[in-house]
Regions:
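C-terminal non-catalytic regions of proteins with extracellular/luminal or membrane-system context
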Residues: 1-178
Length: 178
């Protein structure tokens, strides 16, 4: 239903339909080795988060989304994505929660303390932080080099690092620098 996910529609909550949460709970009763695949356009509350073996956030994968999910679940492709947003535990943890304008009105009253900065500043627990992502393999970082450790506003800084796959599975890594 539109109240849960629809193009051009803002939700007033982060819940999944309760029938989906009940289905997940019932599946977990008979099969605790369960991985949940989410197909959603924005974060959702996950009351079952501590009871599942894994969660694959597929977002809205489009035409090839199903094949991509299958390739990850069957180990044909190594997952290498990182979250581009922080996933809060619940809607009330979101900094814009009290400022939801409704309809076609958007209000950003958080100032510069938005997204992951808000959660870091408030030292809040989140379901998953900005930049989080798992892999079937492991990587080591070495030889970090920064061209200028005391830059001015006009300076260009070049950062380089060597990334080595130390696991037994072929994979790609996204290097993150903040």
């Amino acid at each position: 239903p539109d109240s849960f996910e629809s193009e051009g529609y803002d939700r007033s909550h982060m819940r999944l339909p309760e029938c989906q949460n009940r289905l997940i709970a019932e599946i977990l009763e008979v099969q605790p080795n369960t991985v949940i695949v989410l197909h959603n356009g924005s974060p959702v509350e996950m009351p079952w988060i501590n009871n599942v073996k894994g969660i694959l956030e597929a977002y809205l994968g489009g035409q090839a989304g199903g094949a991509a999910v299958a390739n990850i679940l069957y180990g044909i492709v190594n997952p290498s994505g990182k979250l581009a947003e922080t996933i809060p535990v619940k809607l009330a943890d979101n900094p814009s929660y009290l400022n939801f304008g409704g309809g076609d009105k958007v209000e950003y009253r958080e100032g510069v303390i938005v997204g992951y900065r808000y959660y870091d500043t408030k030292q809040m627990e989140v379901a998953y932080p900005f930049g989080y992502g798992l892999s079937y393999t492991t990587f080591t970082y070495s030889n970090l080099q920064i061209s200028n450790t005391n830059p001015t506003e006009k300076d260009t800084i070049i950062v380089s690092v060597d990334v080595t796959n130390t696991g037994s599975i072929t994979g790609k890594e996204i290097v993150q620098l903040y």
